[in-house]
Amino acid sequence: MSREPLLEIKGLRLDFNQEGKSVEAVRGADLKVFEGEILGLVGESGSGKSVTALSITGLLPKAATVRSGSIRFDGMDLLGMPEEDLRKIRGAKISYVFQDPATSLNPVFTIGEQIIEAVTLHQKAAGAGAFDIAVSSLKDVGMPSPEEMMHAYPHQLSGGMRQRAMIAMAVSCRPKLLIADEPTTALDVTVQAQILELLVKLKRDMGLTVILITHDLSIVSQVAEKTAVMQQGMIVEYGDTELVYRKPSHPYTMKLIDCIPKMGKL
């Protein structure tokens, strides 16, 4: 008996209206994500990766319009869901981590205040209970001195620590799905590896399902069980990561692999 996917996107078509002209950004995308796995969504800038991810919970800009398709998550039809119900899904069941935590975190509030806000909203915890959940979330992501970090402001943290804080906020409500959109791009190589290891750890310890969005196929090959390759708004290849990496079937995937630096070649 085959497993049902946690998230399934079918025939998604989405366009942007620019100065009276319609520009198609996603052209019939199909995607399945199964519970407890990391799926790498790979493609160059402008291929439609991020806008596909944002469409899952209706976080699209006003200029964007979903023309057709379906998005089902945990048995629920997200495209047909009222905004009020979608708000209950965001953060509680589906969380996002974006590329630059410096712009995602509010500079005038402490890390603790921002995590507590999410916990209070989605878990209905308050006071000492919300504080304890926030501290526990910082511990989960390997933040040193989590009690002290609760009182730190974003500008007082390094890039890697800010990203850990963002991930802590994202997992504080124990979502089923974490969408990480280029979470390592703004980080140096050493910190990048630490964040990737953290995503694998959270998947293992929490049973988290992860969509890892990146332009770098080498990153996906390190952590993801499945890989979907996106080009010009379409999923052109999907399968087990090892098979996609070792025996790509689409010319675009082959080109992405050719872009990966290899030892002994300049």
What do these predicted ranges mean?
Residues 66-77:
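Conserved ABC transporter NBD signature motif
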Residues 235-239, 247:
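ABC ATPase "signature
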Residues 193-206, 218:
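Helical segment within the ABC ATPase nucleotide-binding domain
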Residues 220-222:
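A short, surface-exposed alpha-helical micro-motif characterized by mixed small hydrophobic
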Residues 2-6, 15-28, 59-65, 82-85, ...:
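A short, flexible loop at the N-terminus of ABC-type nucleotide-binding domains that lies
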